[in-house]
Amino acid sequence: MENNKKLRTWLDDFNLDHPLVIAGPCSAETEKQVLSIAHELKDSDVSIYRAGIWKPRTRPGMFEGVGAIGLKWLQKVKEETGLLTTTEVANANHVKLAIDYDVDVLWIGARSTVSPVSYTHLTLPTKLA
């Protein structure tokens, strides 16, 4: 029950006078790109900077993101702009790495939810307070 109460009120901590805005590139491709966009957004209504560093695909051989190196870029975004950060996670290792790099919000994309087993494994490295 306590988790449910926290989940219903987490937006209150932002003290926003506008809707929560999450923005950033679909794919983090270079450090320069990630930081440039973050600096453009920092003085806007954006509260959370998003960048996909792991890109689940329906077919192999397509661009699957820059991977864990992108987490360092998200850390720099937070340090240089003060924006909170978010990225998509698709497995338990992604979750652990994102937490280790202090990513603020993790999202689970549609391709990761098709398998109940995969979805369950995403929560294994975490324990909600």
Task: Label each region the model flagged.
Residues M1-I22:
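N-terminal amphipathic alpha-helix/helix-capping segment at the start of soluble metabolic enzymes
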Residues D45, L97-L106:
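Glycine-enriched alpha-helix->loop->beta-strand junction motifs that scaffold or abut catalytic
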